[in-house]
Amino acid sequence: MPIAELAVIKTVGGPLIAAALGVGAQVIYDGFRKGKDTSIINRLGRTMESISPVRDRIGKLSNVEGKPFREVHESLTRLLEDAKSIIEKYWKLRWSRHVCRKYRYIKKLESIELELVRVAREIQVHQWTDIKEMKAIQVHQWTDIKEMKAIQVDQWTDIKEMKAIQVDQWIDIKEMKAIQVDQWTDIKEMKAQISEKHNK
């Protein structure tokens, strides 16, 4: 191709090529953006699915435990409802050209996802703390049970010792009675001897 023709192509075709490349780049970027947005929404959907049962259990506990659980339940409910609402709005705009609005929705969803993850981690921390506290309580209870058993053993030992003392006392009483009987027999014999001497 002659140099002059190349120059014409460069001069006239340059803007067209640039425009074509720009459109191609925009298409690629839009595809990437939609893929990324869809990935965020799918990930958030999985997070919502995993947290919803936890939210329901906390709701049941809030009826028993009171304010702390009720506040967590309300916070999770609000976040899940906000996420659902924004996802619905995003899907309505998915194929439109409202790029800025879609971008804002995605940013809100990312923020909600982070907040949901944070709350879930706090719940896990509280659960772990509760488990450790329950284990500590169980250890104390087991210690108390062992101490009570030791006290019962000591009491049983004391009872056996008291019974042994009572047996010894009973033996002593029987021996004293036997001695008294012997003494009484001796006294009667002495009286009989004195009476015989007196009669003679």
From Swiss-Prot:
Signal peptide per UniProt: none
GO terms under biological process: plant-type hypersensitive response; response to bacterium; response to ethylene; response to external biotic stimulus; response to fungus; response to jasmonic acid; response to salicylic acid; response to symbiotic bacterium
Subcellular location: Membrane
Keyword Membrane: yes
InterPro entries: Powdery_mildew-R_dom
Induction of expression: Expressed in leaves after powdery mildew infection (e.g. Erysiphe cichoracearum UCSC1). Accumulates upon oviposition by pierid butterflies (e.g. Pieris brassicae). Induced in seedlings by the beneficial symbiotic fungus Trichoderma atroviride and, by the plant growth-promoting rhizobacterium (PGPR) Pseudomonas fluorescens after a transient repression. Expressed after infection by the bacterial pathogenic Pseudomonas syringae pv. tomato DC3000. Triggered by various phytohormones such as ethylene (ET), salicylic acid (SA) and methyl jasmonate (MeJA).
Residue ranges of domain RPW8 in the record: 1-157
Coiled coil: 70-127
Keyword annotations from UniProtKB, A to Z: Coiled coil, Hypersensitive response, Membrane, Plant defense, Transmembrane, Transmembrane helix
Regions crossing the membrane: 7-29
Membrane topology classification: Single-pass membrane protein
Gene Ontology CC terms: membrane
Pfam (any one): RPW8
Principal subcellular localization: membrane
Oxidoreductase listed as a keyword: no
Other remarks in the entry: Ecotypes susceptible to Erysiphe cichoracearum, such as cv. Columbia, are lacking RPW8.1 and RPW8.2 but contain in place HR4.
Similarity-based family: Belongs to the plant RPW8 protein family.
Function: Probable disease resistance (R) protein.
Protein name per the record: RPW8-like protein 4
The organism of origin for this protein: Arabidopsis thaliana
Recorded name of the encoding gene: HR4
